[in-house]
Amino acid sequence: MDKNTDDNKKYDKKRNISDEEIILKIKEEVKKIQPELIEKIRELVSIYSIQTEPEENAPFGKGPAEALDKALEISEKLGFNTVNIDNKIGYAEYVSEEIRDYEEYIGIFGHVDVVPLGEGWKYPPLGGKIENNRIYGRGVLDNKGPILSNLFALHILKKLGIKFDVPVRIVFGANEETGFACVKHYLTKKKAPIFGWTPDCKWPVVYGERGRLKVRIYSEMKDLQKLYEFVNGYILSAPNNGVKLKINFKDDDFGEMILRGYRFGIAENRHFFEFVMSYPAICKKDQLMDLIRSNLTEGTELEEISNWNPVLYDKSSEYVQTLQKVYNYATGFNSEPVTTTGGTYAKIIPNIIAYGPSFPGQKDIAHLPDEWLDLSDLEKITEIYALSLYEISKLKNRK
């Protein structure tokens, strides 16, 4: 990735970050709060917050509820007002006095639940051990560290007296890894934000997420050969862009259709072949289902297993361009907004995008043994989020 030109390095002047004194103070505060931020990440990581059987006041199990309580406790100690919505999701809120009753808001959505520990750890998975300038533990990257980084970034702006024309919420979900039920519940109680992000993906700005449609093609035992012939002819021996199925859609934002996740299996005494379509926004789920059905042979049938529609935010919008310029300014890169095959809270929460925390080249960290977050990266992402919030504060967010 190319570094910024000299002109882009003057982003603070070009993008009207005119108050260099405030920028300097923000960067100084980011450095100052790192020890406390690291300690709070370690506290949150020590809670094993995988989903288990529901208990009283713990709809996703004891761990997620305890982690949510801890995140809200940390927020309160930083001086934020907090709200716990039925122990499923909660938030910390920063509101200027003059807009206390204003309903629209900027929302930053992260999560405090984690995937199971798994085997093969060198470091204690709930220990938050620091070694080689890295903190290790389940959830340090996905997503306890990044959402607390955003909380502390907002705390810095609050401390410096930076005002927003709408409230800003840091939202802590407790069911991201196992179904997004937390944010679905949130939307039954609260309005969607006018803009925001989820720090649960990668840099730079992610303005779009591919759709993800999982299907199965079934056959009875007597038609098993027909299933094998269809799958081999139309999928396994064909390019993985779906051209043989006539679903090889592509667009400028996402590129071409991708077929993946191939699996044979048996369910309810029927054989099936399962696969996933990672599809661009130019096509729709029903269109894909109809086209696949039109190719099926007698004795086979198609069933939808799950679907997440694509997300596509206007990359030319003031919000996206502001965040991208902040990222380039803070990192020295000269990158452009991108799309992803992944899926985040942006699939559910309207008007938000994915924004950080993994830098280019950082892969295969979350969900694996010895999940880690580099402490230098932690400081940098906190700086990016703080500067991003500062820039958002200068926009006209009120509708």
What positions do the PLM features span?
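Acidic/His- and Gly-rich active-site-bordering loop/insert found
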Residues: 7-135, 164
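Buried hydrophobic packing segments
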Residues: 71, 147-157, 186, 349, ...
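Short beta-strand
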Residues: 81-86, 261-264, 303, 338
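Active-site metal-coordination/substrate-binding segment of hydrolases
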Residues: 102-167, 172, 368-371, 375-380
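Acidic, glycine-rich active-site loops and adjacent beta-strand->loop/helix elements
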Residues: 112-114, 171-179, 200-203, 359
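Midchain, well-structured core segments that form catalytic/ion-binding scaffolds
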Residues: 176-290
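An extended, acidic, His-containing surface patch that forms the Zn2+-binding/catalytic region
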Residues: 225-254, 301-399
